[in-house]
């Protein structure tokens, strides 16, 4: 889950160790690194650390340069990392086995940054039972950890993906999508979950705290 997330580092030291390991074949030690992160509650410290000089402080200490870039689209951050535009990216361990691995990128996870004890959720509009998801369109980031959460939710009620229709939706568009009349079910992660739940129509019917491990 998002909770098995691979933050490549929260200090410049661990980032440097991770990134250097990706560049061991280079003749000279690598000095410049680019880190991509996207909007998930467990990864937001990257933005804070970059904005408040914490990343620079530790980078200076170890004689390296670290550029931290925020992406509003999770999949795009992984695509850019896979294409070689970034040296590191924040992602879940599960998603690290999809896009980067399929692209032939040998990725090393430095730390497990957090555990999603409810940070990922299936939310229905004006319905409060998981069984109500049957027959609905479900908006989520396709083939991501959200897709896995949906599969586990359906499995828990003896159902399967055949009983719903998955609508691939960028996390950058998820909150706005929920606010439209056409969308009645979404799977996403915090802080998007918290924002969507501010709408009185939104009901969490399944979340990652219900999946052991």
Stretches with model-predicted labels:
Residues 32, 39-70, 99-102, 148-155:
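Short, polar/charged alpha-helical segment
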Residues 113-124, 203-213:
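Periplasmic-binding protein-like
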Residues 95, 166-167, 172-213:
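Pocket-lining segment of extracytoplasmic ligand-binding domains
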Residues 36-39, 111-112, 135-145, 157, ...:
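Short beta-strand->loop
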